[in-house]
Amino acid sequence: VYKRQSLYFMNLDKTKNEIIETAEKIFADTECGKVFRIKGFLMDDDDKWMELNVTHQEMRLEPITEGQKVVIVIGENLNEQRIGTFFA
């Protein structure tokens, strides 16, 4: 029996495009575990806050007024060490 997990990655020094590419790579890598969703907040190229929501079906980026630099990976049997290498 697997339990749902959440892994938090704070204060990432990555661009919007780098975070999007990282999310796609994590979903594609089965060694990361069973990833359901990646969500978080990031700044775009114009220093405006964006909310990120990624699932296997869709990726959404929406503007928001405030946020903090965090990406959360949600799933089961997550390999924290493997996922962490994508954010290094």
Name each model feature, range by range.
Residues 8-14, 44, 73-77:
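Short beta-strand-to-loop capping motifs
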Residues 1-2:
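Short, small-residue-biased leader/transition segments that mark boundaries at the very start
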Residues 49, 53-88:
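Generic C-terminus detector
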Residues 15-20, 79:
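Poly-acidic low-complexity segments
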Residues 31-55:
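Short, structured protein-protein interaction patches enriched in aromatics and acidic/basic residues
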Residues 19-26, 83-88:
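Short amphipathic alpha-helices in soluble, non-transmembrane regions
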Residues 12-14, 23-30, 35:
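Polybasic interaction patches
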